């Protein structure tokens, strides 16, 4: 992960936002203080019907058969149509070359250059090796879970069946996962 030292240059894969921004319309004047102070993690929703895929002129953004929305960074021309189309703000533009600011280059993951859009890809290079995405592994509070919601034996499915959950902006028809 590049350390630019200037927040405006950062490339975001995951970040936090106030609850009211993440789930507009779900909080109200009588929401408890805990809910109002909550800052849920935000990242690509890997939508069932991703608008970013439809608008990409080079097909650099695509949806895999397993539902993960991916990017071919070598095909990206940096037009930012995908950024404009994403209703979740889940994409970042590399305005600077990230390589000089990256302490350790991951040989399993290509480095991108200035002028390319990035997003969360669920650490597909880790998934290919059978390991969890880095954010899930690093979260000390165990607030993040990864898995196949269609698999009735998966942790994510169990959580969806036993805990309250919200889909971000479900009314848009993108089918956020």
Regions found by a protein language model. Name each.
Residues 1-177:
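Non-ligating segments of multi-cofactor redox enzymes
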């Amino acid at each position: 992960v590049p350390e630019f030292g200037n927040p405006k240059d950062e490339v975001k894969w995951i970040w936090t936002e106030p609850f009211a921004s993440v789930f507009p319309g779900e909080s109200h004047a009588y929401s408890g203080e805990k809910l109002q102070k909550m800052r849920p993690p935000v990242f690509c929703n890997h939508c069932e019907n991703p608008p970013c895929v439809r608008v990409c002129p080079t097909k650099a953004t695509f949806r895999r058969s397993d539902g993960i929305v991916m990017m071919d960074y070598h095909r990206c021309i940096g037009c930012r149509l995908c950024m404009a189309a994403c209703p979740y703000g889940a994409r970042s533009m590399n305005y600077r070359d990230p390589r000089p600011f990256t302490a350790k280059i991951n040989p399993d993951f290509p480095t991108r250059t200035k002028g390319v859009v990035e997003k969360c890809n669920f650490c597909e290079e880790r998934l290919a090796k059978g390991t969890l995405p880095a954010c899930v592994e690093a979260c000390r509070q165990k607030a993040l879970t990864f898995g196949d919601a269609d698999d009735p034996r998966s942790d994510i499915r169990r959580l969806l069946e036993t805990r309250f959950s919200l889909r971000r902006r479900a009314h848009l028809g993108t089918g956020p996962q």
